[in-house]
Amino acid sequence: MEQNLNSEQKPQSSAKPRGKSSRSTILAQTVKTGIIKSNLIPMWAGLTLGMYKNKMTFIDNIPEMIFSTVGSALVIGAAGAFNNVYDRDIDAIMPRTQSRPTVTGEMSAKSTLSLAIVMLIIGLAVLALASPLAAAFGLLGVFLYVVPYTMWTKRRTIYNTEIGSISGAVPPLIGWSAVSTDITHPAIARFIFVMVIWQMPHFYAIAIRKRVDYEAASVPMLPVVKGMRRTYYQTNFYLILLILSSFLFGSLSVGIMLVALLLSIAWLVMSIYGYHSNKDQVKWATKMFVFSLFHMTILFTTVIVYSLVGVIFKLY
């Protein structure tokens, strides 16, 4: 990491020159606002679920909702910025990441690192206003994403996806711990398990779509090292596991369980049918990726709505 930070020379890139980006665009690319938004959904699911299961009121927890949202956005953005600093050498090789400010030179590594540190400190302070435990999980999430995933496993093993899925499951814990210290409650434990499983076929789809990029950058993603067939079988394994894990929601709500079950079955059917009927593997993977986002958004939004209705109308 030290070698990466001290080298301020712009990595060689085959990207075509482009016009100067606005400051807002540069900032958005640096902190990865798309990832921030997508991670706030499960954070809110964990938050509202925690309020519901612990029989809390909406009004009394407005400060915690604000602090956990702002704090989570900041620490997730910090993690993205740290990742941009460390990965800028391979980002310069892959077309999908060549426009990142740390590659184009619009943001230096030192400036990006400084931004990440400031965002992390402020984000943790804001999360601490919700609860010290939420801040602790925020720090844990950043650590897991930056060190075990980005620095240790991403460039070394095909199991980088499994390691990355652990950090990806932290946002619901941040939300839950903002309002409750009972982190062993079955509701959040089951939610975290589903979150970990969901990430596997999601990131396998990304790896297939960008297989050429990862291969060029020598990133050992599963389809690069083991090929498409192994990735397809492993994707289906996790989708079957996701179907089975849908029943974990049964004790919370039959409705949520059915939503999770139907979405997961549809995803598996799409995987099997799409793989065998479509010779274009990238096109198949793109559909799988899009559906994974649909799956997450619908399922977690259902959890949020169910929990909020229960909290507002006190349906404990």
UniProtKB/Swiss-Prot annotation:
Annotated membrane topology: Multi-pass membrane protein
Pfam family, one: UbiA
PROSITE patterns assigned: UBIA
GO biological process: heme O biosynthetic process
Keywords recorded for this protein, A-Z: Cell membrane, Heme biosynthesis, Membrane, Transferase, Transmembrane, Transmembrane helix
Membrane-crossing segments per the record: 62-82, 117-137, 163-183, 188-208, 231-251, 252-272, 293-313
Catalysed reactions, semicolon-separated: heme b + (2E,6E)-farnesyl diphosphate + H2O = Fe(II)-heme o + diphosphate
Classification via PANTHER family: PROTOHEME IX FARNESYLTRANSFERASE, MITOCHONDRIAL
Main location: membrane
This protein's pathway: Porphyrin-containing compound metabolism; heme O biosynthesis; heme O from protoheme: step 1/1
Skewed-composition ranges (Polar residues): 1-15
UniProt entry tagged with the keyword Zinc: no
GO molecular function terms noted in the UniProt entry: protoheme IX farnesyltransferase activity
EC number per UniProt: 2.5.1.141
Database matches in HAMAP family: CyoE_CtaB
Protein name in UniProt: Protoheme IX farnesyltransferase 2
Subcellular location: Cell membrane
Protein's UniProt keywords contain RNA-binding: no
Designated gene of the protein: ctaB2
Function statement: Converts heme B (protoheme IX) to heme O by substitution of the vinyl group on carbon 2 of heme B porphyrin ring with a hydroxyethyl farnesyl side group.
GO cellular component: plasma membrane
Assembly: Interacts with CtaA.
Region (Disordered): 1-24
Family: Belongs to the UbiA prenyltransferase family. Protoheme IX farnesyltransferase subfamily.
Note: Carbon 2 of the heme B porphyrin ring is defined according to the Fischer nomenclature.
